[in-house]
Curated annotation (Swiss-Prot):
Tagged with keyword Disulfide bond: yes
Function: May increase the toxicity of alpha-latrotoxin and/or other venom components. Is non-toxic to mice and to the cockroach Periplaneta americana.
Tissue: Expressed by the venom gland.
Protein name per the record: Alpha-latrotoxin-associated low molecular weight protein-2
Taxonomic path: Eukaryota, Metazoa, Ecdysozoa, Arthropoda, Chelicerata
Length: 88
């Protein structure tokens, strides 16, 4: 019985770890065949944008319609400008 519990635990942990490098395209309004690398990159842009603006709604607006809204474009622009600014 202990072996069965250990195996179930390992399977659960491995499943959680393996899923960290992929995202569900439907969560972003994307087609199922969307490139995972692009999805991860765009998701990271939205997370950075949310952190930059310190507003939780930014992430939701940024990722809407598979990153095709003006909010996403503004995030890309804002992050580029933030990189150009000298650190305080």
């Amino acid at each position: 019985m202990l072996k069965l519990i250990c195996i179930a635990f390992l399977v659960t942990v491995l499943t959680l770890v393996a899923g960290q490098d992929s995202l569900d395209p439907a969560e972003f309004g994307c087609a199922d065949d969307v490139n995972q690398a692009e999805l991860l990159k765009n998701n990271d842009i939205c997370l950075q944008c949310e952190d930059l603006h310190k507003e939780g709604v930014v992430f939701s607006l940024c990722k809407t319609n598979c990153f095709t809204t003006e909010y996403f474009q503004h995030c890309v622009k804002d992050l580029e400008e933030a990189k150009k600014e000298p650190p305080e």
